[in-house]
């Protein structure tokens, strides 16, 4: 678990979205989900509406999230060593049948509905196939407290290897693991791809977010100021990048055309994970 994650709790408060200038919600035309780590809740911020608490029961220190095409929300219930599913149709919460988890954090779903879980304290990534064939351990080498996960357009898996200060790529075809060419990473956490295939990582130990172009160009620093242990990442439908600014108790929006603003949700306490519906991300 990232050193930034604080073992404390506080009551949640919410505020109507919008800004002092009367602009619409920063997240555009799709809901934004935020896991509030210290308050043990997940919030849903709809376009043009007020934030509401997702009906997930018994959460302790929620972190990573993923949404499937049916609107089902997967939540890494880190403190309870499990992953829960909140159905999009309002049905009862269920627990993913994953055995032996210890501090699960990052989640990712592939096009077939298979779920990947960063089983952090077990130093592994596990896969729960959608066909019910049973849990498997993804073949990786040397992971230490894996954190964020992401999948590219061809199904390759990327893992933020937190203690080893690197991001690794696990090819979908079973080829050998490689290290992604980021430089000077410190405690990487969240991962996300934009629609161009550029890979973004929360470089939490350096209080910044990095971007690695898909065309092989050099890494760049995302122009977001004042970050303190950034965590989860997500893209909105208009291409804006959203950053869970963990130790600043806020979510930051970085629009495609530049600038920065704080997403209007009051009362956050160490936001960790972010998610938007599939197919609504990117540029």
Residue ranges and their predicted role:
Residues 75-80, 84, 100-122, 145-149, ...:
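A generic tandem-repeat structural signature
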Residues 45-50, 86-91, 128-133, 170-175, ...:
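Short loop/turn segments that connect beta-strands within beta-propeller blades
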Residues 31-34, 72-74, 114-116, 156-158, ...:
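Conserved beta-propeller blade signature
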Residues 1-17:
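Secretory targeting and sorting signals
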Residues 40-44, 81-85, 123-127, 165-169, ...:
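A short loop-to-beta-strand structural motif that recurs across blades of beta-propeller domains
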Residues 37, 78-79, 88, 120, ...:
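Short loop/turn segments immediately following the C-termini of beta-strands
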Residues 18-29, 58-70, 99-112, 142-154, ...:
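Beta-rich, blade/repeat-based domains predominating
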Residues 51-56, 92-98, 134-140, 176-182, ...:
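A short beta-strand motif characteristic of beta-propeller blades
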């Amino acid at each position: 678990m990232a050193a930034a994650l604080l073992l404390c709790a506080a009551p949640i408060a919410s505020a109507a979205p919008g800004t002092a200038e009367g602009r619409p919600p920063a997240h555009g035309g799709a809901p934004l989900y935020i896991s509030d780590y210290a308050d043990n809740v997940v919030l849903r911020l709809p376009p043009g509406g007020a934030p509401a608490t997702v009906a997930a029961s018994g959460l302790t220190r929620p972190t990573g999230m993923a949404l499937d095409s049916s609107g089902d929300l997967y939540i890494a219930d880190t403190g309870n060593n499990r992953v829960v599913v909140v159905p999009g149709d309002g049905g009862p919460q269920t627990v993913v049948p994953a055995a032996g988890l210890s501090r699960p954090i990052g989640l990712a779903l592939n096009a077939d509905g298979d779920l990947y879980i960063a089983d952090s304290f077990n130093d592994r990534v596990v896969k729960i196939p959608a066909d019910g064939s049973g849990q498997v351990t993804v073949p990786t080498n040397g992971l230490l407290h894996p954190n964020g996960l992401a999948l590219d357009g061809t199904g390759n898996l990327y893992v933020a290897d937190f203690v080893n200060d690197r991001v690794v790529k696990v090819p979908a075809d079973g080829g050998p693991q490689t290290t992604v060419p980021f430089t000077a990473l410190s405690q990487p956490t969240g991962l996300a791809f934009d629609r161009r295939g550029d890979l973004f990582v929360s470089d939490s130990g350096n209080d910044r977010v990095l971007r690695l172009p898909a065309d092989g160009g050099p890494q760049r620093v995302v122009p977001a100021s004042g970050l303190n242990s950034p965590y989860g990442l997500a893209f909105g439908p208009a291409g804006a990048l959203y950053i869970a600014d963990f130790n600043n108790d806020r979510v930051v929006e970085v629009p495609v055309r530049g600038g920065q603003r704080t997403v209007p949700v009051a009362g956050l306490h160490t936001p960790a994970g972010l998610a938007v519906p599939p197919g609504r991300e990117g540029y």
